[in-house]
Structures are given as structure tokens and as C-alpha cells.
Regions:
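Long, leucine/valine-rich, helix-dominated scaffolding and oligomerization segments
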Residues: 2-211
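Short strand-loop-strand
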Residues: 320, 324-471, 479-499, 507-597
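Generic hydrophobic, helix-prone segments enriched in Leu/Val/Ile
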Residues: 108-112, 116, 288-289, 310-320, ...
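Extended, domain-scale alpha-helical bundle/helix-rich regions
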Residues: 185-381
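N-terminal start-of-domain structural block
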Residues: 10, 16-19, 289, 294, ...
Length: 597
């Protein structure tokens, strides 16, 4: 379902309007669009795709083609929005249905883009040259939507996608259209990306933002932000490599995204290469970073917004060429992988709790006190008065005694009914393969099969244990790529070589104990004490009660949020002083004093 690679071949094979099965006269086509069954997404998508395929094989005037494409904009958007739910917010690797949904969204956008490109080429050759700028912009905008879908599906770009992007920009540049405004329905006069040049730079910068290292909402947030930022970047023909600024180079005659100039080994000429300088975006990024710092990253929401941590990564991606801190070594070592904090906590707890210890490793239960009295359920008992007891004044009532034939006491207490504890879910151990290894992390390859179905997201917490090793290393997924057929490559960064399972609870009435992973302080390597917790269970700077599998709870303060990926939160913590429930001023205080001396 790929668009043709050669636009010349498409132009040469255009058929007259009379040969088409669809009536592409504007009035008739508007009626056809109005009759689309929008409630039936599959049928609407099938009809729209068929109409686009035939339209792109039909010779039409530029103005009519643009009018027809704008009629199809709303149905295409509705179909795309409907199929997005099959791959946005879904764990990786995507199932077959999710991959097909992404292909549908990409294909519709590419066919729309081809139609806009045909209109642009027809406009620059005919009398409607004023239509060429909006047509070229429309093509780049549609190709951008296809590229956004590629990144949100963590899929490799389909063949010829980047070639189409470069080709449309080359057409706009050759005819002086890159800075001309693209007017059209729904276009704001202040829309700074409403030029072909800005739309092209937006997509170059998106690809350079390391989108495979982002969560899907972050990719969308950067894409939306670049609608305002992209115009600030500079794109120039290749010049003096010493004097010309710009870290990135673009090959207009290739099917490749932009890359670092220092790593580019391909032949480059002023006619075929452009240099992208993202340095002018620095002021925009600094202003955005200052704004989000005032709000803070806590609590982190899962919506599409820019956070301080994301902006800092963008500054590095667009302004400084990253250097690998450690050399990679090839490997094909089998490894066991646990996905998610709950699975890791369960495995570590079971491995470190002797089977003979009854109840070990379970969450601590709160001591009954005034909170339990206030929040507990009411308890009612009725029964016969004891013989010889003092009569109650209510015994004078005619119905105070028990019914005849029921001389036994009745206890009504819902909480005392026998309840079966809910079984703990069993989390699978996945068998994968370590492909590349370095002191900082791994590239792991996973295929379908084995115990359970592997499902993860970028930012997920993993535990990895290579074959022959005894300990689980904690790691975080930094990037992912779906390779099709359920295969998945993930890049992970090792966080800690080990951790202790434990529990934490906020210091407020009725707060539950939540599972956490505790990493002790290691002063020799300047590693502060760390806590890995569910993403929204605890709050930055608050004091929580913390305990391991053994020992009493102790209060600690969450001193700093290292990161919150939306899958887990990483905090540095420090002792807050005292034990849970306060001190009694007796021997416990003296014991702590001897220890400090």
C-alpha cells in the first residue's frame, strides 16, 4: 500500500476524467461525500481510500483537485481518529489489529499527500500558480501526519516516505514557494507553520527529537509544539563546512531522515544537501522550560503536554551531539525479563522470603486506633438479657422481648462474614535475547511465544537477568521499535544492579500501603538512597512511612523526583527522623541516641 516512488510515472499515467468510475465534478463529489456512512468507520475508510486511489490516477485541474481533497479532509480525519485507538495507548508489541490500524492511517495520509503534490505540480505548470503554495503545504502536512503515526506506532518508516517529503520540499524550493503563506479553510492568519518551509522543518526536527525514545503522548506534544517553533530553525544550502553553522544535514535525493553532519559519509553537494540549524530554537526552549518549572513536573499527567524533563531532552537532541559513554559489545545471550513494578516486586519478594515464614513479605497492617474506630463499620448485637441482670428500661416496651421460639442470640456483623482473600495475580517471566550490551544498558530482542504475552511501553520498568546470573538488574525502556509479527527491539538503560522489595504509605488517614522497590545509599559511588514507586501513589517532598520485608516502618522524606515516566516514579529519599507514630521519649529515644554517638 505504498505510494509510487516515481512522481513522473504517476504524472505520465494520468487518465481523463471520463474514464473514472467516480464523478469528480465538485458538485457531484460533494453529494457523494455527504452520503458516506461516517458511523461505519470500516466502510467509510474503504470508500474514501478507493476514491483517493482513483483521483490520483485521474487528470484534474489544480483548483478542482484541491477542492475535492478538502472535501475528503473531514472523513479522512474521522477514520484516522477512529483507528488510532487501536495503537495509541496500547502496550508493545502491537497486535496485528494495531499494526493494521496504523497502516490504514499512514496510507490514507500518503494518498492525500500524493493528491496535494499532484495539484502543486499541475499548478506550477499552468495558470493557477497561486495554488501551488497551499498545495505543497498540504502535501507536507499530510506526510507529517503519516510520520507522526509511524512514530506513535514505534514502526520503521515505510519505504519512500522520506523521499516523498524531500521531493515535495524540493518542488517548493525550486519554485520559490517555501515562504509563501498557505491560505485555506480553517487556517489562522497567525499560523506560523502555514508555509511549506516551516512544515518541512517541523518534520525534520520531529525526527531529530528521538521520537522512539518518547511515550506516545510526548511525541504528539512535541509535534504540536513544533507548529509554533519550527519557523525559527534555519535550513540553508550546503556551504563552507567550517563557517556554516548547523549540526544536521538533509539529503534531498535520498529516502533517509536528517542526520548529524559529523557522522555523514555520503556524497553531498549544494544542489542535493541542506544544512539544518536548530540553534535559534534555544530561546523558545528556554522560555518553555522556565514556564513548566514554575508549574513543576509533579503531578505528571499522561496527557499531551511538555514537561521539564522532556524539554531538557529536546535541548540536548537539537543542540548537542550525543556521545556514547560506553562501547557496545555484540551479544546473543538469553535473558529473563520481568515487565512492570508489580511483577518485579512479586518476584523479588518471593525469592527473598523463606517459605517457612508465615505471612512474611505481606503489607504491614495498620494498628487499630481512633482512625479505625471512626472509619470502621457499625457493629450491632441483639440477645436475651442475662438472668439476674439489671432490667433495662426498654424492657417495658411490649415488643422488647425476642420472638417466641427464637431464644437464641443473633449477631449481625457483616465484617465477620467469612471472606476469601483475592488470589495474587501471577506475572510471567519473558524469555528474550540480549543483542548489544554495555555497562549502561542493553538492546533486547523479544519474539512471541513462551510464558505469557510480552507487553510494555517506553518508560516501563524492567528487571533483566542474563542466563547464568543470580541477580535481577533494574532497567527502564528508553526506546522501542516494532519489527512486525510480534517481534520487538527495545533499548534499556540499567538503573540499579539490585533492589529490595518493600512498602510505602503516605502519612494520612486511610492511606494504603503500596509496593515499592528500595535501593540503599552507596556513598562510595555517590548513589543516594532511591525509591521506585507507582507513578501517582506518592508525592514529591512529602514524608512517607517506608519498610522493607523485615523491620519496623520508618519515616522518610521524598527529597527529589528523578523522573516520572508514567509507568513508575523514581525518587531520592532521606531519613525524616523518628519512627512511625512518633516517639515516646523513653528507651527508644535513648537507643537512637547511642547509635548517633
Amino acid at each position: 500500500m505504498n505510494a509510487p516512488a516515481s512522481i513522473e510515472a504517476v504524472l505520465a499515467s494520468l487518465q481523463p476524467r471520463e474514464a473514472a468510475s467516480h464523478d469528480f465534478r465538485p458538485r457531484a463529489f460533494r453529494a457523494w461525500v455527504a452520503d458516506l456512512p461516517l458511523a461505519n468507520v470500516a466502510e467509510t475508510g474503504r470508500r474514501v481510500h478507493a476514491a483517493l486511489l482513483e483521483m490520483n490516477r485521474t487528470r484534474l485541474p489544480a483548483d478542482e483537485r484541491l477542492e475535492l481533497l478538502r472535501m475528503l479532509a473531514r472523513p479522512v480525519e474521522e477514520v484516522t481518529a477512529a483507528v488510532r485507538r487501536h495503537f495509541v495507548g496500547r502496550p508493545l508489541p502491537l497486535p496485528e489489529r494495531g499494526r493494521k490500524a496504523a497502516r490504514v492511517a499512514i496510507e490514507l495520509a500518503r494518498q492525500m499527500a500524493l493528491g496535494f503534490e499532484l495539484a502543486a505540480r499541475e499548478a506550477v505548470r499552468g495558470r493557477g500558480s497561486q495554488l501551488a503554495a497551499p498545495a505543497a503545504h498540504g502535501a507536507l502536512e499530510q506526510l507529517g501526519r503519516a510520520l507522526l503515526t509511524v512514530y506513535q506506532a514505534y514502526a520503521p518508516p515505510p519505504p519512500e516516505l522520506w523521499r516523498s517529503l524531500h521531493r515535495v520540499y524540493g518542488l517548493a524550493e525550486a519554485h520559490g514557494l517555501t515562504e509563501l503563506p498557505a491560505s485555506g479553510p480553517g487556517r489562522r492568519a497567525t499560523d506560523v507553520t502555514a508555509t511549506a518551509g516551516a512544515a518541512y522543518k517541523r518534520l525534520l526536527l520531529l525526527s531529530l527529537a528521538c521520537p522512539y525514545r518518547m511515550r506516545q503522548g510526548e511525541v504528539r506534544a512535541v509535534y504540536e509544539a513544533l507548529a509554533e517553533w519550527a519557523a525559527d530553525a534555519r535550513l540553508e544550502p550546503l556551504g563552507d563546512p567550517v563557517r556554516q553553522e548547523g549540526l544536521f544535514v538533509v539529503h534531498l535525493d535520498s529516502d533517509e531522515p536528517p542526520r548529524y553532519r559529523s557522522l555523514d559519509r555520503a556524497a553531498c553537494t549544494p544542489a542535493s544537501c541542506r544544512v539544518l540549524d536548530a540553534a535559534p530554537l534555544g530561546e523558545r526552549l528556554r522560555a518553555a522550560l522556565a514556564a513548566v518549572r514554575e508549574e513543576g513536573d509533579e503531578p505528571l499527567v499522561t496527557g499531551e503536554r511538555l514537561t521539564a524533563s522532556l524539554l531538557r531532552r529536546l535541548v540536548l537532541n537539537w543542540g548537542v551531539m550525543p556521545r556514547r559513554g560506553f562501547a557496545r559489545a555484540a551479544s546473543r545471550t538469553p535473558a529473563d525479563v520481568l515487565v512492570g513494578l508489580s511483577a518485579i516486586h512479586q518476584r523479588l519478594r518471593r525469592e527473598r522470603t523463606p517459605a517457612t515464614e508465615k505471612g512474611a513479605g505481606t503489607p504491614p497492617q495498620p494498628v487499630p486506633g481512633i482512625e479505625a474506630v471512626i472509619s470502621g463499620r457499625a457493629h450491632f448485637e441483639t440477645g436475651l438479657p442475662q438472668a439476674g441482670g439489671v432490667p433495662d428500661v426498654w424492657d417495658l416496651a411490649f415488643d422488647a422481648g425476642p420472638p417466641s421460639g427464637s431464644p437464641r442470640m443473633v449477631v449481625i456483623d457483616e465484617d465477620r462474614e467469612e471472606r476469601r482473600p483475592e488470589p495474587e495475580p501471577e506475572y510471567p517471566v519473558h524469555r528474550c535475547r540480549v543483542e548489544d550490551i554495555s555497562p549502561a544498558g542493553y538492546r533486547i530482542h523479544c519474539e512471541p511465544g513462551g510464558e505469557g504475552e510480552l507487553q510494555l511501553k517506553v518508560g516501563e520498568l524492567l528487571a533483566v537477568r542474563e542466563e547464568g546470573e543470580a541477580r535481577w538488574q533494574l532497567a527502564v525502556v528508553r526506546w522501542a521499535k516494532c519489527l512486525g509479527a510480534g517481534k520487538l527491539d527495545v533499548g534499556v538503560q540499567v538503573l540499579f544492579p539490585d533492589a529490595e522489595p518493600g512498602y510505602a504509605r503516605r502519612q494520612e488517614a486511610g492511606a494504603p500501603w503500596v509496593p515499592v522497590l528500595i535501593v540503599p545509599e552507596v556513598p562510595s559511588v555517590q548513589q543516594p538512597a532511591s525509591l521506585l514507586a507507582p507513578p501517582f501513589a506518592l508525592r514529591h517532598t512529602e514524608v512517607v512511612n517506608l519498610r522493607g520485608l523485615s523491620g519496623r516502618p520508618r519515616p522518610v522524606r521524598l527529597a527529589r523526583t528523578v523522573e516520572n515516566t508514567g509507568c513508575f516514579a523514581h525518587y531520592h529519599y532521606a531519613a525524616a527522623g523518628g519512627e512511625e507514630g512518633g516517639t515516646n521519649g523513653g528507651e527508644d529515644d535513648l537507643d537512637s541516641l547511642w547509635g548517633s554517638l
